[in-house]
């Protein structure tokens, strides 16, 4: 552990702060976190936080969710412009237009979305909870926003529902094609292909396992000397290579990188602790609507 990491660990106790980090964050940032997880795990951990402050090492929608679930706490996002391109593909007005078009449908909103979009949805979901959330709803028609790839995957798992898709996606996952999957299998024929459902349908169909980042990690950890092609952001590849030195871990693409997730540096976390970052603030009405959607997700899951 370096000097900067030691300083952060001392200060977070002094300032009564909980540090959370997503699996896609740089490893040195993960190392100073109190908890590392996928979007669902981080939302649950934020909800149960006892500390007066939360530093969310991730992207903006994650920090917004932490604030929504903890309106009385101070929440920081270390890098203000760490956004999510998928979240930017849809607005609250887009959701309201879909509601008007499909008045009998429930709106399921992937957590990779803004607080404003969550506020006009019925319930949120993560990649690990999406199927359970969709099954929990009495409506036959489900508007699934914004990720068309996750929505298409869930439509296959729950064929009794009519899933209405929105044309949004994660550009990092959507850039991976069936040709990439075939090439990776040819290069590593002994390896199992583990992919995230934000990937295109042609990639998910080619996989041995489809699941959340936590699910991918758990699957690989169960075979510590196995061979795996990792079909999600390379932060997961980095974690597995460090944790499982006897395993053979290959990225599905070498450039499978979310630039926004990699923006966070240790110095940014320190700036939060030393008061040089502006906390997350959201309109009260937006927070109230979004909180209902997030809390329903957590209750169902």
Residue locations for each model-derived region?
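Active-site loop-to-helix "anion-binding N-cap" substructures in soluble metabolic enzymes
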Residues: 1-230, 234-301
